[in-house]
Amino acid sequence: MATNVLNSIRERGFLDGQFLIAMPGMFDANFARTVIFVCAHSEDGAMGFILNRPQRLTFPDVLLHLQLLDPDEVIRLPSTTREFQIQAGGPVETGRGFVLHSDDYLSDSSIPVSDDICLTATLDIVRAISRGEGPVKATMLLGYAGWGPGQLEAEITQNGWLTCPAQEELIFSRNLDEKYDRALALMGVSPAMLSTDSGHA
């Protein structure tokens, strides 16, 4: 059912489940050389997450801040849990956390955003990850990128973004520095081929 809905949206020209790849002419420092995964797009605007910006906070920092664990419990966490990746998802609501994850984990608050990827923004998934009971693939993002009605479409028309279908492996890759060039490679494009004033895909 979710897949049918997503296909219908794409047929109407919306970009749910797509990558936005910033063109060289993107002079807004918030978005220069970014790869964004679009989670929602309609006549009312768009929402997505930057996939290649690091975040200083660690997962133990988040657990302590939310008072989900005490310091002694955090110390005893397995290294894979302590190193769970947190990224800066965008300039809007930077104190709010979101988890993009594979669809093997679902709660009442999980929202499908592509055929195999869901979004959960409640504490239940943070608790599950801290207990080793979370999804197989996941990344936590603080903040998001948002656009008002028609804003994203205008930016694309003005050659601000390239677009292409998202790739799950790239979404969850921990190698943030490589994501921009790898996203371009999905389209058969290299950074050297782009100019600040040439077209979008």
Curated annotation (Swiss-Prot):
SUPFAM superfamilies associated with the record: VC0467-like
Pfam families: DUF179 (PF02622)
InterPro entries documented for this protein: AlgH-like
GO cellular component terms, A-Z: cytosol
Domain of life: Bacteria
Record family assignment: Belongs to the UPF0301 (AlgH) family.
Name this polypeptide is given: UPF0301 protein Smed_0532
